[in-house]
Amino acid sequence: MARVTVEDCLEHVDNRFELVMLSTKRARQLATGGKEPKLAWENDKPTVMALREIAAGLMDYAVIAEAEIVEDEPLFAAFEDESNEAV
């Protein structure tokens, strides 16, 4: 297993706070099984895999935000009905 350092990850994000927030969101996606890893899973925990993806430059806020928008779309489909009639 390759060791992931904070310095490797900071080359792709602005600061440590962003790194924590980004890696948390990505690890949660991986842990819940909703998203597939972008690297080969080498018996790593979701947090390590998230950091490996960030260090490789495969994950940033744009990718996370895009995934969240796609997940939210079905929730708002019910509100697109244009009828305002009382039930």
Curated annotation (Swiss-Prot):
Cellular component aspect of the GO annotation: DNA-directed RNA polymerase complex
InterPro entries the UniProt entry points to: DNA-dir_RNA_pol_omega, Pol_omega/Rpo6/RPB6, RPB6/omega-like_sf
HAMAP family assigned: RNApol_bact_RpoZ (MF_00366)
One term of GO molecular function: DNA binding
Taxonomic source organism: Pseudomonas syringae pv. tomato (strain ATCC BAA-871 / DC3000)
Sequence similarity: Belongs to the RNA polymerase subunit omega family.
Keywords from the UniProt entry: DNA-directed RNA polymerase, Nucleotidyltransferase, Transcription, Transferase
Domain of life: Bacteria
Subunit structure: The RNAP catalytic core consists of 2 alpha, 1 beta, 1 beta' and 1 omega subunit. When a sigma factor is associated with the core the holoenzyme is formed, which can initiate transcription.
Pfam entry (one): RNA_pol_Rpb6
Catalytic activity: RNA(n) + a ribonucleoside 5'-triphosphate = RNA(n+1) + diphosphate
Keyword Nucleotidyltransferase belongs to the record: yes
Enzyme Commission identifier(s): 2.7.7.6
Entry's Gene Ontology BP terms: DNA-templated transcription
Task of the protein: Promotes RNA polymerase assembly. Latches the N- and C-terminal regions of the beta' subunit thereby facilitating its interaction with the beta and alpha subunits.
Annotated protein name in UniProt: DNA-directed RNA polymerase subunit omega
